[in-house]
Amino acid sequence: MLTTLNKALDTIHRLAAETVWSEGVTPMKIGDSGEFGFWPKGFSVGATAGNIRYSGRDDMMLIVSDSPASAAALFTTNLCCAAPVVLSRNHLQQSAASMRAIVCNSGNANAATGKQGMADAQAMADAVAEQLSIKPEEVLVASTGVIGQLLPMERVHAGIVALPATLQSNSVLGAVSAIMTTDTFPKFYAVDVALSSGTVRLCGIAKGSGMICPNMATMLGFLATDAAIAPELLQTLLSEANRKSFNAITVDGDTSTNDMVAMLASGAGAEVVAGSKDEALFSAALQSLMILLAKLIVIDGEGATKLVEITVKGAVSNEEAELAARTIANSSLVKTAIHGEDANWGRIIAAAGRSGARFNEDELELWFNEMPILKKGLIADFSEDEAAIILAQPSYSITLSLGNGSGSATLWSCDLSKEYVEINGSYRS
């Protein structure tokens, strides 16, 4: 656990230092022990070992709001969505986006499990509601893990009964570790945001390593704030931040059955009003936090050794720029070239050419970081040695200009290695 924590802290510190935080944001100082005041006012969090799939580690997590909290959530676009996704989507509507708790298990996705899976997801909400003396529809349920297997409900129920005794408001490590599957390190961060009527805390935890593709993938993100925000505004802010973060990453091009990003606002702190400067400040902080968490997921991509920012500009529209960027980011040939540290620019423009984005190839321009690789007229006059220095770095950018408009989009991707095949070839064994 110490090695995992050290990896997390080193990676988080590096990304946080590289982030240009917006006005009024104070990034959290995270100690070497990982023990610090993490959660916003009005929240308590617990974790326990339900022994669902993993032994010797926590695999169940509970977030509780002391009072009804404004809630917002986004779910997978996969048509084969898991039972907890269906249930949570329904609960969000039934409760008028007022929630008290989020419960999550790892190791079993409760996906492709039919009517019994739906009954089991409901039973999880019912059990949490009974333990906390709240309504079942005030509970969001999330699961992640192997698809197509029923939950061991006796163990799940026992875990839920044990969770309330573990609730606390200081440490993040138990909760974030409990939601991990193939992740190699926990992903979390928090910031304070200075608003006109006081400072609020904004924090998030996430998991994800494989099945990561735009439109969210096998990733879970849980965010909390003590700001007072109406549910409608919270949903708008979360949706916009999600579009620029979790929906802008890819590891392997697969979209999961269980994706969920949920956010709770306890209302114990300063108010954020629609159309105010406070809304702009809070929105900018939320976007930066979620982008950091999204980058952590890409860095931890199964077998990944590189984090690459892919920007397409000069497109007819932002939508076409995103088409090209996604196709490049998901290209196996591009990803293997990234892993091999090969300046194979032809694979990049070939991917753009099949993306559906419109351009004239003679207008294309390409850069690795600030280094020109391809100039207009398909002139590739660059130093392979200088390019190799950039490609050997753990993190760098690829920028492609289509020369056909003002549209742009940025995504984050990683390389594709032999280890990815090894991890996913033995996932169930």
UniProtKB/Swiss-Prot annotation:
This is Arginine biosynthesis bifunctional protein ArgJ. GO terms for molecular function: glutamate N-acetyltransferase activity; L-glutamate N-acetyltransferase activity. The record marks 144-145 as: Involved in the stabilization of negative charge on the oxyanion by the formation of the oxyanion hole. The keyword Transferase applies. Its EC number is 2.3.1.35, 2.3.1.1. The active site is at residue 218. It catalyses: N(2)-acetyl-L-ornithine + L-glutamate = N-acetyl-L-glutamate + L-ornithine; L-glutamate + acetyl-CoA = N-acetyl-L-glutamate + CoA + H(+). InterPro entries: Arg_biosynth_ArgJ (IPR002813), ArgJ-like_dom_sf (IPR016117), ArgJ_beta_C (IPR042195).
